[in-house]
Amino acid sequence: MTKTKPAPHRVKMHVKKGDTIQVISGKDKGKVGEVLRTIPSHSQVVVKGVNIRTKHVKPRQEGESGQISSYEAPIHSSKVMLYSTKEKIASRICYTVTDDGRKVRMLKKTGEIID
């Protein structure tokens, strides 16, 4: 019998859905895109226009033709950095507290507040 691997524990991620990021390693290095979905249990993110895979879909009904569809596959979150669209530069983040007491994410290189 084969055992299934238990899901790894949830890890806090530095990116959220809707963030603009830049890929820093791999075949899509340098590409900029928006985070469509995060998968914290595996520390992965799905980014628009990055890691495109093709899938061959069989016809479901008789007379219908098969298709080749493409989709974005997840990549590891350590391969991405947050990207400043104003300064056109990727940066690490730090957490700061604003004057009104909110904890926000800030880009280290530019000082730009993200959320």
From Swiss-Prot:
InterPro entries per UniProt: KOW, Rib_uL2_dom2, Ribosomal_uL24, Ribosomal_uL24_CS, Ribosomal_uL24_KOW, Translation_prot_SH3-like_sf
Pfam family, one: KOW
Keyword set, alphabetical order: Ribonucleoprotein, Ribosomal protein, RNA-binding, rRNA-binding
GO cellular component: ribonucleoprotein complex; ribosome
GO biological process: translation
MF annotations from Gene Ontology: rRNA binding; structural constituent of ribosome
Subunit structure and binding partners: Part of the 50S ribosomal subunit.
Family of the protein in this entry: Belongs to the universal ribosomal protein uL24 family.
General function of this protein: One of two assembly initiator proteins, it binds directly to the 5'-end of the 23S rRNA, where it nucleates assembly of the 50S subunit.
Protein name: Large ribosomal subunit protein uL24
